[in-house]
Swiss-Prot record:
Organism: Arabidopsis thaliana (Mouse-ear cress)
Coiled coil ranges: none
Name this protein carries in UniProt: UDP-D-xylose:L-fucose alpha-1,3-D-xylosyltransferase MGP4
Enzyme Commission number, as recorded: 2.4.2.-
Cytoplasmic compartment residues: 1-41
SUPFAM superfamilies: Nucleotide-diphospho-sugar transferases
Gene label: MGP4
Similarity section: Belongs to the glycosyltransferase 77 family.
Membrane topology: Single-pass type II membrane protein
Length: 360
């Protein structure tokens, strides 16, 4: 687990375009002579038809490619649902909790939602859907709690860590957060491969601009400093972009703008295979003197490389954990297995506790 402005300037691909429709052909482009299926041209046409059917038919009933003729009135409504409308609907006490989700991540969304519901904060959740299938599924089950900010992404590539699709997916995050700050709301962002064990809001001490958690596995003392840690070997810190809380201050907005700038100057390439986290850390380091920052307690917000790999530390800090992040591991099945091993995969037995219920 940055919305650069150029991402919004790309031509928007309409996922509802019918792949089988075409404009009428002019009579000048069609021969009046009948084509025999046994002729060379006939065989080529037949082969082309079979290829087209083989490619598109398996997707015909897929939720990722809904037909424009099959859109219900409610689905059409959600296509026009805006971020200001959505934030106003879900916000409580001036605060909204957001996550960004593509269709393959729905099981993780549901698992995370169960844990959020147990802390009585589910009504504040806004799912930023990265594809129309997610938008429709969430709003079908939980009306008003999902919004799509165009352009929609390819959900089949957005979840592959290190891919350009994954970069495009994560790179939109600071722009989403900045837009919410500009609307005047506090915002908490979570990756959905997380589980809440306690209410994290009790740890947001003071009135700082930005709160975040360290992604390092080195054990800190329980009374460690809450200042931004010193840079590591790469010249920057190693803060996780998976869990962030921001107040609608000039400092928080400056941090998001700098994050966007960093992602624009360090785009994805086959050589680097970047994600959004290095850009976030450079932004933190470059604005440290202008933004009031707060490093959250390691005991309450441990990285997965510590929580899942150091049993002694987990026992010593028992009862202090607020949010567990299932990182330092790649792959859906591996993440699910690890959650199950630690009794944190809640959807198997507790799906009814999620606002989405059991997802088929």
């Amino acid at each position: 687990m940055a919305q650069q402005k150029f991402l919004h300037q790309r031509p928007i691909q309409n996922p509802f375009t019918n792949p089988f429709s075409s404009s009428p052909l002019s009579t000048s482009s069609i021969s009046n002579r009948p084509i025999s299926l046994l002729s060379r041209n006939g065989l080529l046409l037949l082969l082309a038809l079979l290829v087209i059917l083989g490619v598109f038919l398996p997707w015909a009933g897929s939720p990722l490619f809904p037909s424009p003729n099959k859109l219900s009135p409610s689905q059409s409504k959600w296509r026009d649902y805006s971020l200001p409308q959505a934030v106003k609907f879900v916000a409580k006490n001036g605060t909204v909790i957001v996550c960004a989700v593509s269709y393959p991540y729905l099981p993780f969304l549901n698992n995370w939602l169960i844990s959020v519901s147990r802390q009585k904060h589910q009504d504040q959740v806004l799912v930023i859907a990265e594809d129309y299938a997610t938008l429709y599924k969430v709003n079908e089950k939980w009306p008003g709690h999902a919004v799509l900010i165009p352009p929609a992404l390819d959900s089949q590539t957005a979840h592959k860590f290190g891919s350009q699709g994954f970069f495009n997916f994560t790179a939109r995050r600071p722009q989403h957060l900045l837009e919410i700050l500009e609307l005047g709301y506090n915002v908490m962002y979570n990756d959905v491969d997380m589980v809440w064990l306690q209410d994290p809001f009790q740890y947001l001490e003071g009135k700082h601009d930005a709160y975040f958690m360290d992604d390092m596995t080195a054990i800190k003392p329980l009374d460690h400093s809450h200042d931004l840690p010193p840079p590591g070997k790469k010249g920057r810190t190693y803060i996780c972009s998976c869990m962030i809380f921001l107040r609608p201050t000039n400092g928080a907005k400056l941090l998001m703008k700098k994050w966007i700038e960093e992602l624009e100057t360090q785009p994805w390439s086959r050589a680097k295979k970047a994600n959004d986290q290095p850009g976030f850390n450079w932004a933190l380091n470059k604005t440290a003197n202008q933004v009031d920052m707060y490093l959250l307690s390691q005991a309450a917000f441990p990285t997965g490389g510590l929580y899942f790999k150091n049993k002694t530390w987990v026992k010593e800090t028992k009862g202090k954990h607020a949010i567990i992040h299932n990182n330092y591991i790649v792959g859906f099945e591996k993440k699910i297995k690890r959650f199950r091993d630690f009794n944190l995969w809640l959807v198997d037995d507790h799906a009814s506790e999620s606002p989405l219920g059991k997802l088929e």
